Amino acid sequence: MKTTRLVLLILGLGISPLVSSADEKAKPAADEEGFVSMFDGKTLKGWEEMPATDKKAWSVKDGIIVGEGGEGRGYLVYEKRDIADFEMKFSYRFPKAPANSGVNIRASKDKTGKRKFQAYHVDIGHVGIGKKVLGAWDFHTPGRKEHSCFRGDRLVIDKDDKPTVTKIEGAITAEEINKGGWNEVHVIVKGNRFKFSINGKPASEFTEHLPESKRLDKGMIQLQLHDPGMIVEYKNLRIKIDRPVGAVPLNF
């Protein structure tokens, strides 16, 4: 009987830490809580090509979304079409340079015909790694000023659409980009405030104080193919949607 009790005690001591360890592994990291995957790693389920073409520009290879540029600009659009406030994380790389891509947010059809879509654009293009491309916010906003918010800029747009730019301390530099390798991006969009980082360092950000009627309040998330012949790869795409539309949280 004593031997049996001793064996049970030893087994109990051995199992307890294993269960505890498993529980710990099951818990998401604090900075990943609330995020869900946007990509199943095998198919493009939940995504749609725009415009639709006979020659598919987007595919999945070895758990990676691969985009190959054809005639005109192409987009891969996430299934949820009216997203306003959210955080998005992903990794990207360009197997060959130069190449240009980015992510449109709050995108919708451009009724003026200037572009296919109006949107705020997270620019991650490696076209000489210039300040006007990589790490910038682009404004694809017909009918109003299309401001410059380059890598390292903090832009504030007042109610009259006048810009003020200051510099972000510790912003990512061209030398800190993995040319030809994977780079991690984190986009945060809340109300009228927008920012993103690359490899854990701030890239650029802006705040708009325009009337709501002049701002883009919600829309699609689109991965972009900018040029013919280019290749871009995406993986580990995940998103946390906070609200369809909402006010800016304090202390953001």
Which residue stretches match the model-derived regions?
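Positively charged n-region of N-terminal signal peptides that target proteins for export
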Residues: M1-L6
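Bacterial N-terminal signal peptides
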Residues: V7-P17
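Carbohydrate-interacting regions of secretory-pathway proteins
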Residues: S20-F252
